[in-house]
C-alpha cells in the first residue's frame, strides 16, 4: 500500500502544498527518495509481516475467519441478488471474492489497511522511519484493545474506525502526504462509507464540522482539503449504488437507515406512544398489534414471528420509516432525552467479543447453502466448538477502554494536539 514504506514517496512537483508542507515537516531532509539499506528494508519487511500476523492472530488461532450474526447477511448478497437492511453489498462482494481462499484475503485486506493507516499516522506526526515503533504499537493495540478481533472477523465494523482516521489524515495532515497517499485515503474513505450507513453518517458529520472550520479559518482548513473529503464520500455513494445495481439490477440505496431508527424508538417506548396516539388508523398495520410489540430491537428484527408475519423489512419498511420520521417531529424533547441516554449506554458498552458466538445459525446456513466447500473448516474452527471466551480478555480490555475515553479530554487539551497544519 502507498505510504507503508516511509522511505519511498512520490513528490508532486505541481502541488505547492506538497512542497511547502514537506519542507516544513522536515521529511525531505530525512532523505526522502533515497534507497534504503538492505538491512533496513529487511527490518521493515519483518515489522510488516509480524504486524499483519498480530492483526489476524485471532483468526489464525481459530483456524478460520471469525464470524458474526451479520456475516451471513453480507455473504448472501451476491448469491441471492437482493438488498437487505444494513447489509452492504460492497462488503458482500469483497467476501465473495475471498471465498476461494476461505476469506483469508479479506482478513489480510482489513489488516493491511489498518497497518497502513497506523504507519501513515506515525509518519504524519513525525514518527516515521521507525519499523520497530510501528511493530510495538501494533503489538500493544493487539494485546490491550479489541483491534485484532475486528480485523480478523467478517464484519464491517473495522471500517468505521479506519474511515474516521483516514478522513482525519486527509483533512488535517495532508501536508505530510504524497498525492498517491491522498488518493489511497480517498479510496479507503469511500470504501468505509459504502460499508455501512452509520459510518457514512459519522463521516458526513465530521466533514460538516470541517466545513464550519473552513468558513471560520481558511488557513486551518483549506477549501482543497474539504473538496478531497467531499470527493471521497461522493465516491463512496457511487460505490454503494454501483454495487447495489450490479447485484439487485436496480439503482437503489441499501435499506435499513430509518428501520433501525424505528428499532431504537421501539426499544425506548416511543413507537408505543405514537401508536397509542394515532391508532386506529387503517394506513398503519401495526395498530392491530401495538400491544404485542416487543421492547427489544434484536427481538423485533431477528426473533419476532410478528415481524416475519407482516413481511419483515419489505412489508413494513415504509411504515416503520413513516413512524420514525413522524415521531422525530412530534416528540423532539423525548427523542433528545432518549438519544442522550442511549448514547451514554453505548459509550460504556465497550466489551470485546459482542456477537462472537458459537450459535450463529443464520450465518452457518448461508455458508452451508452457498459455499459448502467451506463448511468443514468452518465447523472445525474453535469458535464453532465453543472454545472462545472473552471473560479474561475483558478484565483488561473493558477498564482500559473506559480509561482511554476518560483521558480523551486531556489528550484534546494537550498543547501538541492544538497544532493544526498550515
Q: Where do the model's predicted regions map?
A:
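Extracytoplasmic catalytic/substrate-binding loops of multi-pass membrane glycan-assembly enzymes
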Residues: 61-75, 82-101, 316
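Specific aromatic-rich, kink-prone transmembrane helix
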Residues: 120, 159-176, 184-189, 206-207
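Membrane-interface alpha helices of multi-pass inner-membrane proteins
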Residues: 182-196, 232-236, 240
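Membrane-interface anchor segments at the N-terminal boundary of transmembrane helices
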Residues: 43, 97-109, 338-421
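Membrane-proximal stem/loop segments at transmembrane-domain junctions that anchor or position
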Residues: 253-371
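Transmembrane-helix motifs of polytopic, lipid-linked glycan transferases
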Residues: 104-128, 139, 143, 162, ...
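Loop-to-helix entry region of an early transmembrane alpha helix in multi-pass inner-membrane enzymes
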Residues: 89-93, 100-119, 134-136, 150
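Short acidic/glycine- and proline-prone juxtamembrane loop motifs at membrane-interface regions
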Residues: 149-159
Amino acid at each position: 500500500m502507498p505510504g507503508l514504506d516511509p522511505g519511498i514517496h512520490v513528490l508532486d512537483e505541481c502541488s505547492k502544498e506538497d512542497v511547502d508542507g514537506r519542507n516544513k515537516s522536515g521529511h525531505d531532509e530525512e532523505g526522502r527518495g533515497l534507497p534504503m539499506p538492505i538491512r533496513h528494508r529487511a527490518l521493515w519487511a519483518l515489522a510488516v509481516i509480524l504486524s499483519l500476523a498480530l492483526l489476524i492472530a485471532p483468526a489464525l488461532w481459530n483456524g478460520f475467519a471469525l464470524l458474526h450474526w451479520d456475516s451471513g447477511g453480507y455473504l448472501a448478497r451476491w448469491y441471492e441478488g437482493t438488498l437487505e437492511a444494513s447489509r452492504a453489498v460492497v462488503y458482500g462482494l469483497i467476501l465473495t471474492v475471498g471465498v476461494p481462499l476461505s476469506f483469508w484475503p479479506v482478513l489480510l485486506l482489513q489488516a493491511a489497511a489498518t497497518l497502513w493507516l497506523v504507519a501513515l499516522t506515525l509518519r504524519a506526526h513525525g514518527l516515521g522511519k521507525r519499523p520497530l515503533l510501528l511493530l510495538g504499537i501494533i503489538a500493544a493495540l493487539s494485546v490491550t484493545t479489541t483491534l485484532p478481533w475486528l480485523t480478523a472477523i467478517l464484519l464491517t465494523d473495522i471500517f468505521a474506525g479506519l474511515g474516521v482516521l483516514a478522513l482525519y489524515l486527509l483533512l488535517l495532515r495532508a501536508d505530510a502526504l504524497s498525492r498517491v497517499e491522498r488518493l489511497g485515503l480517498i479510496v479507503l474513505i469511500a470504501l468505509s462509507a459504502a460499508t455501512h450507513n452509520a459510518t457514512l453518517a459519522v463521516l458526513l458529520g465530521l466533514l460538516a464540522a470541517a466545513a464550519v472550520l473552513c468558513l471560520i479559518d481558511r488557513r486551518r482548513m483549506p477549501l482543497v482539503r474539504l473538496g478531497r473529503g467531499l470527493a471521497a464520500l461522493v465516491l463512496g455513494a457511487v460505490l454503494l449504488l454501483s454495487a447495489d445495481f450490479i447485484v439487485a439490477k436496480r439503482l437503489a440505496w441499501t435499506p435499513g437507515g430509518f428501520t433501525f431508527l424505528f428499532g431504537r424508538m421501539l426499544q425506548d417506548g416511543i413507537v408505543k406512544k405514537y401508536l397509542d396516539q394515532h391508532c386506529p388508523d387503517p394506513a398503519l398495520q401495526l395498530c392491530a398489534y401495538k400491544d404485542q410489540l416487543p421492547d427489544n430491537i434484536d427481538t423485533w428484527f431477528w426473533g419476532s414471528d410478528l415481524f416475519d408475519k407482516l413481511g419483515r423489512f419489505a412489508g413494513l419498511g415504509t411504515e416503520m420509516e413513516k413512524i420514525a420520521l413522524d415521531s422525530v417531529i412530534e416528540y423532539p424533547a423525548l427523542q433528545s432525552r432518549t438519544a442522550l441516554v442511549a448514547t451514554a449506554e453505548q459509550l460504556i458498552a465497550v466489551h470485546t467479543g459482542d456477537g462472537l458466538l458459537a450459535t450463529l445459525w443464520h450465518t452457518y446456513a448461508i455458508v452451508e447453502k452457498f459455499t459448502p466447500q467451506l463448511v468443514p473448516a468452518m465447523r472445525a474452527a474453535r469458535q464453532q466448538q465453543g472454545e472462545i471466551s472473552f471473560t479474561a480478555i475483558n478484565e483488561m480490555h473493558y477498564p482500559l477502554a473506559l480509561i482511554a475515553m476518560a483521558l480523551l479530554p486531556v489528550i484534546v487539551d494537550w498543547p501538541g494536539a492544538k497544532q493544526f497544519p498550515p
